[in-house]
């Protein structure tokens, strides 16, 4: 068995190679690799991916996403675990351990983990290199009936109820849509407009909202990169996407980049991610004054596009949405888990939902 590692240049060469094109399974999709290559926080020497091969057969891989955090007044390079997969046929051959310890040897003191399978939490913590798992509490508001997805599709023994459940969802959502026609029109005090120009004024804005310490650093280039190099492409699964274990295509995927203006002055920013009718507030930079108008904007977008849920980890926004009780069906508390190296003094409370690779998935 052979483990290959790839930095930025090597990753570019790999995805253009005949070897990559001939693999039955690939360790990274082409467009996801391009995103890694263009990451503004990625240095030429950063190892981004480790892949294990048995002859010409891919049997496992692990990858990271470089980032920058500010802790104790110092910018520090960090690496978010972004993918980890081992072929079922090789899970008894220590492939996972070989891959993960290749990663640990290089980035032990700078590794961050989020969006992990709960069953792996104890395994990570047994290494003794991480702070106790931290959690951020968020809120999810279901805005359409989706019993089929929430219950039937997840519980195999209830699959016989799927046709009836789909019919019920469609009928109830039709009723809910008709009711929405009679909603009272809102009046916004601020101007919120879609804009993906990340210039010097934008940089000044987000700098004013980022804390002086204990946060994941972002600048204009990061947001341009996120929108320019998505990990998920909109469309049906194809031959290429079936070669990759993780998601690379989705029936609906896109971003909505919104700037907030008060008296023609840029005063806030919000980045929304929409995937398969689910809206997530990935980044939010604004004062309390704008929260009411932002909630109106989000709820109007949900109504116009018939989206099924809203997820936010900004308590101010969640509290404002909660006031509009007739605009959603069920509220639910959700949590996001973070495992952070002991070597960097940072807490999860400074993270935004989109930090790490969440904004891409």
What are these regions (language model features)?
Residues 3-6, 11-54, 59, 132-274:
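Amide-forming acyltransferase catalytic core, primarily the GNAT-like/NAT-type
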